[in-house]
Amino acid sequence: MASSSRSASASPDLLKWSFFALMGLCVLTVLWVDERFWINPADPHWKHVAPVKYLLMLHGLAGVTALATGTLQMSSRIRRERTALHRTLGKVYIGAVTVSAPVAVYMGTSTLEPVSIRFEQIFQGGFWLLSAWIAYVCIRSGQMQLHKAWMIRSYAFTLVFVLSRLPDVYYSSYTDQGIADLLWAMVVIGAISPELIMTATTLLKIRNAKARARRAAGAGDLAPV
């Protein structure tokens, strides 16, 4: 019974870290395919980003910081055993988002980007910043469950930083409308992600509890009288 209980509790952790491993692979892929121009001065993409290269660098460094610290924020072990570290990482995450999100909105609504995505960029960057700060206000008010939900939502918007670039692995070019549709879809998914994740987690716990109850009942029936 103890081993089955441990395996049931380990199941969500396995899913969580498998997800983060997949995201790590996505990050490496995006860095190689889409961000390689940083180490290649002859890359023609430099001409496109030249007017905002320092802002882009600031946005990128802050975004990577949010991505890394946000991942560690999801560690239940750090939350349990290293509370001070968890809080420090949370503050670094908030600071990184506070820097990166407004810069993203500024660049995303400039003439460097297609008209079709400029309005979306306000929502994407705005929700990213808003959800991070709501998560912070919730934890300062002692509302742990609300903090968790808003932190998941904020981190989902952080992942857009990576996932929106994945199509570049397969397509060298696509329409402005295609980019807009993809980004709006990610905004919607990011907005509802806490409900999806927390609902799935709750249903998994219920299923595991019922399975343990059935095994316990079966063991009781087989016990010697």
PLM feature spans:
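Alpha-helical membrane insertion/targeting regions
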Residues: 2-225
